[in-house]
Each structure stands twice: as C-alpha cells, then as structure tokens.
Amino acid sequence: MAGQVVQYGRHRKRRNYARISEVLELPNLIEIQTKSYEWFLREGLIEMFRDISPIEDFTGNLSLEFVDYRLGEPKYDLEESKNRDATYAAPLRVKVRLIIKETGEVKEQEVFMGDFPLMTDTGTFVINGAERVIVSQLVRSPSVYFNEKIDKNGRENYDATIIPNRGAWLEYETDAKDVVYVRIDRTRKLPLTVLLRALGFSSDQEIVDLLGDNEYLRNTLEKDGTENTEQALLEIYERLRPGEPPTVENAKSLLYSRFFDPKRYDLASVGRYKTNKKLHLKHRLFNQKLAEPIVNTETGEIVVEEGTVLDRRKIDEIMDVLESNANSEVFELHGSVIDEPVEIQSIKVYVPNDDEGRTTTVIGNAFPDSEVKCITPADIIASMSYFFNLLSGIGYTDDIDHLGNRRLRSVGELLQNQFRIGLSRMERVVRERMSIQDTESITPQQLINIRPVIASIKEFFGSSQLSQFMDQANPLAELTHKRRLSALGPGGLTRERAQMEVRDVHYSHYGRMCPIETPEGPNIGLINSLSSYARVNEFGFIETPYRKVDLDTHAITDQIDYLTADEEDSYVVAQANSKLDENGRFMDDEVVCRFRGNNTVMAKEKMDYMDVSPKQVVSAATACIPFLENDDSNRALMGANMQRQAVPLMNPEAPFVGTGMEHVAARDSGAAITAKHRGRVEHVESNEILVRRLVEENGVEHEGELDRYPLAKFKRSNSGTCYNQRPIVAVGDVVEFNEILADGPSMELGEMALGRNVVVGFMTWDGYNYEDAVIMSERLVKDDVYTSIHIEEYESEARDTKLGPEEITRDIPNVSESALKNLDDRGIVYIGAEVKDGDILVGKVTPKGVTELTAEERLLHAIFGEKAREVRDTSLRVPHGAGGIVLDVKVFNREEGDDTLSPGVNQLVRVYIVQKRKIHVGDKMCGRHGNKGVISKIVPEEDMPYLPDGRPIDIMLNPLGVPSRMNIGQVLELHLGMAAKNLGIHVASPVFDGANDDDVWSTIEEAGMARDGKTVLYDGRTGEPFDNRISVGVMYMLKLAHMVDDKLHARSTGPYSLVTQQPLGGKAQFGGQRFGEMEVWALEAYGAAYTLQEILTYKSDDTVGRVKTYEAIVKGENISRPSVPESFRVLMKELQSLGLDVKVMDEQDNEIEMTDVDDDDVVERKVDLQQNDAPETQKEVTD
C-alpha cells in the first residue's frame, strides 16, 4: 500500500501519498490581518500621537501633548452589533496634557476621541452591522530606483528616482547630449550640478573633487549657468515658484521644507532601510577592482590593498571596517540649506572593461541612523554618485516588479495613514483655537475637535476601495478574502494604466504570492493571494521560509530562515523534492535549484537553502486542488476561483480525494468554532458548547474557568446563504487549543466540504452534454444531494414625512382581506408563513397631500371627528421571483430606545425569508480543475446509464472537455476517487507531491477495479451495453452561486426611462430585454416588417400606442396603428436645440404637428417610488 495514514483533526483519517515530510507547520492563515491590527493598537497609535506632539500655538506659549491612550469596553458585543446595524467599536480615550509656558501651569485631561472599530477574532470588522474585510495593498516601496531606457537612437540611457513615503520626488536623467539633469517634484529640469551647488559645493572644482572627473559631469558643468551656492538657490526657487520674487532666504526655506523637514518629507523606516541598502558601500563594491587601499579609520592600518577585486568573501571579511565608516570624509558646508557637516564614504575603483585604466569614485551615504526618516545631503550625493557609476558600468538597475521593491500595506498601516490624516486636520483646528481662546480658563477638551478624526476613520471603513464587504459564500471565500493582496486603491495602480509587466508572474513571487490564483478579466494580476507559508515582516515585505544548508557539511539543518525577495537573490535554493539521505545530505551530486530568475542544475556544494514544502508556491485555495501538477495553469486558475463560489449545501461532504489542506483552511477561515484554551467539554447543545479549562501548574493538571462558545444557527451570511454551525464534539472530550468544536457552513467533521462526491461517467448522451453541459440523475434532486438553503432579508422603514408620519398597520386601503391573511394585528407577517412574489410582508401607509374636502366628507368629518384618511399603500411586498417561508421578523422602535435607528425613522421592520433550492436545469456546476458547465437535462434515475452491478451513475460529462483544456487532474481524481470509495477510505494527494501514476493504479488494483479504470456501462433506456468501455469514477463536484433562480426574469409592463420612455434594463430594475441595432438588422434581413414595427413602437417607446394596445388586449379588440415613438421626438428636440429647424412632412408635404402626449391619452402615469434602485426616475403604466 502506497502512502501512510494521517489524522486530520479529531474525526478524519486520510491516506496521504506525500513523500516529503512536513518540516514546518502551516502558519495561522489569517495572521496577516490579526497581527497587523495588534501592531496598530500596540505601537501604531502611540507612534502617531508621538509624531503629532506637541502642537504649539503661533506664539509658542501653549503646547498640547498626547501622553497616553486606552480603549474602553465596546458598547455592543459582536452579535448585538450585527443585529442592531451598529459598528463593533470601543471608545478611544486619550490622556492629553496642556502646558502654558508663561505661567508654567500644566493641565491634564482624558479626552474621548471617538469610537474605534475593533477587529473580531476572525480578522474582520463589523461596520453598520455588516462584516467587512480590509484588503492588504501592494505598493511601491519608498527607496532610490535606477532605471535603464533606450532612446529613439538606440542609445542606453539611465534615469533615477528617489521616492519617499510622502513628500517631493527627486529625479535624475540624461539627455542626448550627455548632460545630467535633475527634476524636483516633477517640475522642469535643471542641470544636476545646480542642486549640488545649492547643497553647499559652490565651485566647479569642489564638485569634480567630490564626484570624480568624467565627461557627463564636465558636460553638465558647461550647461550649468550658475557659479556659486547663492545663484544656484535662486535658480531653483525660480523653477519651483515661477513668478515670485526670489531671495536666498526664501529659496533655502523652500528647499528645506521640500526635503529636510520631517513633517513634510518622510521616507518611513522602510524607506530608510531600502535607501541605506542601496547606497551603502558594502552593497556597491561587490566584484569591483580597488584603485586605492581601504583604511581602517580607527587604527590607520590598510585592510585591503589597491588592485584587489572584492568578491563576496572579501566583502564579508571587511564588513565591520566598511560599517565603521572606512575612507570617510566630512564636509563643512557654508551658506547651504543645512548647516550641519555632511559625512560620506568614498572609494576609488577602476572602471570595468576599460583599457586606459580610468578610475571612478564610489560614494556611500555613510549609513545614517535608522531614526533619520528624512533624506540627507549624503543620500543625495550618494545617489548622484550611483547614477554616474551606472554610466561607467558599475551598479545595477532596479526591476520595479520585483517583490524586493514592492511592499504590503496591511490593515494596521492603512488605518494609521487614515488616522494621521484625521489628526493633521485636527491639529489645524487646535492651533486656531489656541490663538482665540483665553489662556486662563482654557482646557485640553476645549481645544480638541474630534470630528475630523472620526470622519476620516468612518470614511475609510465605509467607502475606501480597500474596505470590502466580506465574501462569505463559503469558508474558503472568507479565508481567501482576508489573504487577498490588491495593487489597486489609493496610492496604488489603476486598472487602465497597469501594464502587462506589473500583472505578470515574476520569479520573486515564488513562495510569496500565488502564481495561479488571480481573477480573470480586467483585474488579472493586480489582485493576488498570499502563498500558504508566506508572512509579512516589519517593513511590509513578504517573506517565505527556507531550510538552511550547513556550509561546511552541506547537510540540511533544522534551522528555518524567512527571506525577503531581495535577500533570496543572493542565495542558491534547492527544490523541496531534492533527494536527501538520513543525515540530511543531498544524494545527487547535481541538484535542481533556483538562482534569481533561473532554474538550473548546480553542484550540491553550492546550495545555500532548500524549500520547506512543495506547496509553499501556491495559495490556500490553490493548495486545495488535488493533482494540480497535472492541470494546465489557466484551468487551475479557474478551479481555484470557482471553489470560492461554491454554495454551502444542506448535507455537505468532504472530498474522498483531498489534499490535506481542507482541515487547515476550515480551521483558520473563521467559519468554524475553535477552542481558545485546552479543556474538557462539559455541555453540548445545538446552540452552545461549554468547555471547562484544564490548567497545568507544577506538573499537576487542575480545572480552571468555564468557557462558553455560542453557535450561530440559521443566520443569513453576507452572500444570502445559510450560516449554520453544528457541534462535532461530545461531553467528556478533552480538546486541545485551536481544535475545532463546531463545523460551520460547507464543513464536515472539521474539514472543508464545498460539494459532494458523485459518480461521474465521461460519455456523450444524445448530445445533451454538448459544449460542457452537464447531464444529471434525478436522484441528486430527490435525495437533496445538491440542495442549498438561501436566506433573503427585506426591510421596511416607517419615516416622518412632511405630511405626517408613515404608519405600519394592517389597515391598508384597497387591499382585499385575502391579501392580509398572513399579517398579524400589527400589520407584520407571521413567522412560518409561506409567501410568494407580490405578497405583503409589512403593511405600511404614507400620508397623501391634503386635498379640498367635498361636502359629504365635511359632513362625515363633523359627525365622526375624523376625515376619510388620505393615505396611499407603500407596503413592503415580496419582490418578483422571490418567495419562501418567513424565518424571522425583527422590529426596532424609536420609542423603545433603539438609538441605532437613522434620523427620521420611527420604526424599522426586518423580515427574513428562507428558500430551499433544489438543483435545476440551468444551474452551474464545476469540479476543482476548472471544468465547469451548466446542467442541460435532469434524467430519471431509471434512464441513466448503469454499472454492471446495477447502480446508475449520477452525472455524465463530455469527454471532449478534457484534451483541449489539458486539465488531466480531473481524470486522475476520477479514478482515485472510485478506488477510495470502494475501499471506504479518504485520501490526501498534496499539490506537487501527491499520488503519482503508480500510486493511482496500485490503489485501483487494491480496490479490485479494472487495470485501466474503465468499465462497461449499460444504457438505462434499452438495457444494451454501450459500444466502448467508459471511464467512470467519483469526482468532487460543486454547485456554484450562479443559480438559474436568480437569473430567470420576465416582464410584460413595468417601469420606463423618463427621457426616452423605453423600458429599463436588468432584472433589478424589472426591465425588458434590449432589442439592439444588430437584432433589428436580423429582422430586416428576414423582411419581418410587422414584427419589427411592433418591437420598435408598442413594445418600446410609443407611449400612446402601448396604453391603447394594453386596453385592446384586455377588451379583446383589434390593436390600433402605432403612433410616433418617443425617441423620435427626443431626436427632433436635440436637433432643434442645436439650432436646426426640423419639421416632419407627410406625403402631400403638409407639416405633421408633433404635439406632446396628452395626459388623457395615457390611462395613468405614476412615478414608481418603490423602484428606488433603478438608474433614473421611472414612470409605470398600469391598467
């Protein structure tokens, strides 16, 4: 027997075919969300308050400092927040200190700074009652970038850009005449030497001494019209502020504020880290030949002689000397923007491949401290030096798509940036109030206005592109949404501008971003998924784990290092499936490995690291596809994406053929309930589990406190499916930390169960499975195999109107008693009532405008003291095509103190309707390999082809769907699934390390099946065997969210667009089917004149004709001739508005009057207020 049995959770054993043992457990899959938010609460908030403190007034007398903060208890717990449409948030209280410097008085106060949304344990936020996810954003890291470009004459040119986190960009570029220019903040370009002079290197000789002599520098100096620092400062000021009178002082303060003021310019810690990495000498001298010795500044000894070529070993040896600033120089700059001395490191090297032995100077930025978040003059000089070095052939250009140059902004940082915007707006208000208020009686509370802070947080959670309504179709969809990486959003790319290169798979994605899972369509490659083992480091770069190879013994050690993409570029990495002996040494002399972008074969002595697992390349969703290695990547992409659209079934079933990922994905998704502590189960009910903690002290175990775990029962998920949790533990079980206590939707015994295992035959059947269609047995309908439960929510509000309040009541004008049969005395539908479309759910009346009373009404009013009520019926009805059983009704009243109701609403009623949807013709099904199709026919069980033992098969798929799609994984799954079913086992075939051909065939033999996996099938209609043997097996098939019930739509009359008077489009607007230009051509080609006429008039925008037609149909009369379509009038009006005199003439050249439609012609037109989601105001024609 191939494979070994592995336990997944408490209840499931699987035969696992993996050959490579797991050396590292998968991390918690949603830690990218939870860790980032924890960092924000622990450090991010304090960091921001520190940045903004102190706020001083214009005189410097008052100073406001933010000392400390604390989060209080949330007003509503999680469940209550969802029920009340509230935000799950805690009050943020900040300790603020006001110092009055004149008197030395200090006032301290705790100030309320608004409610701050809290993250749930499962990595989501509840905002206005809805669960939302903050997606991490992939952005360009702040740093110095060098880029190579070819000009129109075919010459190599370079440009460089210093990109900060916030602040002005600095760019260098060359032109056709070999002059180097600089651009400050995207303005017009200046010769580079102008900026150097402005920094204090005033004479030509100083500049040449600094950067070393070369022709580019000489050309630039010739072009430069300035001669000293003052002239350079004035020149820069004129470029940046044209039209303003330049003075030296103004120019200095402008340059200072652009680059050296920490409030205006911020590299952030990641920018400082990347800049130091790029510009420090230790990274730039690699493989260079020295033209001067390197001297230890402290001892004066020569560490490396002139003429030495510095390889990696040599650089490692002298690293300490380089870091302690060997060969450093300090320049005292006078009259420049910054008065402090500038320290740089400079070493002369020989220009590579130069026969004349010329030298060039490599200048480093002398490694400024990581606390320095601004750019320094040393950075600017070093970046210029790098640019000149590139022109001499020293150094590398950057690949912007490399993950070493792209970083993640996770929840914490996105929130911090948003909070910072709010705080800076608040800072302005505080300054203004300081100058107005009386210093004697002033308190911190009076100075601070928290509105801008609250507004910016609300805006971020409510309407940012990165704050998304959680995809809750199934646990995998939840999990993937939390691990999603988007390159879109504020400060990111836009769909239209993103090039092919950005979207493409890059070698640095290996183990960091999934190369397979990305949406099809305009977002392809811009939205990605985090790989299974990847994590995010403190700078926001994605790291992936590798096993370290001992450099002396060349054996694999137990040490696991997490490497970022640019760190990995220095190492040779062996594949996870390299053969090792029992001591961890490579068995082959030549090993398949990766170095930078190349897959090569190298000697085993050259290996530095080895992959931890074959599945570290792919994301959690992709890792759920068995036999992924046998599928084409495009189909695998569809398979990964479609698993997220699977509808939770009534009776879910875990796959016979899994990958071992099902348990982990289900546990971490947040849909299951997991134990927060080790303990013993004391009580189990369908809606609650009680666990007594077991605590170990001094080796003795004793009982601790009791944990309660409430279960969600038949709740509505974000995508309208049923969210229900079922216990899978029994009283007395001892559960470990993080063990699954209760299954969520689409789960079975602690494993993800998105679909069902069904018996599938690859065969055609009367052409019903043409074009990927699926033929299904009626058994799957009868036995509720693919039945799902759907819950829809409808709400009705009673508001205050100008004419009086709306009322929820049973007393509705002009409605028969039979229409009210499901309503209780309040006018609200009973729980358990069965309703169909058009039925009243909540009776509601709205006051009409008061009209002049008739004499009779005045008499009635005088007698009964009440006039006949002028109200119209605005009841909530079941929309077209919906219906089901009323599951729950929630009523919120303002009188009962429901402060969560929005202003103007007195009462809110929510009705939940549940539907049980069996599978239909027209529903979409798929497997896990991108093999999707629509059900074309449901065949009676007795007519389905049957196996030799008489069992009918469940589904027939077209064999032509396999060869051209190249997803052979489905065939292997089919055979292995059948073997597993016959053996009564579950199997796991992990990606890239699963069952191979031999394993599959040996398991088939073990199950007693035919060697080729095929069987004779008999036609259920005739009892005859089919001509050839057929591949029959068990495949895991899912029912997708694209259900025909949601798409079926029909209309006779309905709302019309206001201007063109044509029917609206789309099911949501109850619209019609568009008959477009090409369809008109088709009818013209057939000469179907009358059909064409009625389609373009009565059925579209002939307002008079359609009313008369409706009347004629009702009365059984002949239909009258059509009149002029409204769109023709619109066209005439448009031409007339252009100043053209347009008239319509008949055959006798008499003008036809184009009068507007008279209201008498139309029976009744009313603006349809219920259709509030339609794009324009509609008019509806009623009989």
Curated annotation (Swiss-Prot):
GO terms assigned for molecular function: DNA binding; DNA-directed RNA polymerase activity; ribonucleoside binding
UniProt keyword Transferase, yes or no:
yes
Question: What parts of the sequence cross the membrane?
Answer: none
UniProt cross-references to SUPFAM superfamilies, sorted A to Z: beta and beta-prime subunits of DNA dependent RNA-polymerase
GO terms for CC? Answer: DNA-directed RNA polymerase complex
Q: Name one Pfam family in it.
A: RNA_pol_Rpb2_1
Please give the CDD domains that the UniProt record associates with this protein: RNA_pol_B_RPB2
Is Nucleotide-binding a UniProt keyword of this protein?
no
- Extract the signal peptide range: none
| Keywords, alphabetical | DNA-directed RNA polymerase, Nucleotidyltransferase, Transcription, Transferase
Single Gene Ontology BP term?
DNA-templated transcription
**What reaction is this protein's catalytic activity?**
RNA(n) + a ribonucleoside 5'-triphosphate = RNA(n+1) + diphosphate
EC number(s) reported in the record = 2.7.7.6
Q: What does this protein do?
A: DNA-dependent RNA polymerase catalyzes the transcription of DNA into RNA using the four ribonucleoside triphosphates as substrates.
NCBIfam families per record: PRK00405.1, rpoB
Q: How does it assemble?
A: The RNAP catalytic core consists of 2 alpha, 1 beta, 1 beta' and 1 omega subunit. When a sigma factor is associated with the core the holoenzyme is formed, which can initiate transcription.
UniProt similarity note: Belongs to the RNA polymerase beta chain family.
Q: What's the protein called, per UniProt?
A: DNA-directed RNA polymerase subunit beta
Q: Which organism is it from?
A: Staphylococcus aureus (strain MRSA252)
Name the gene.
rpoB
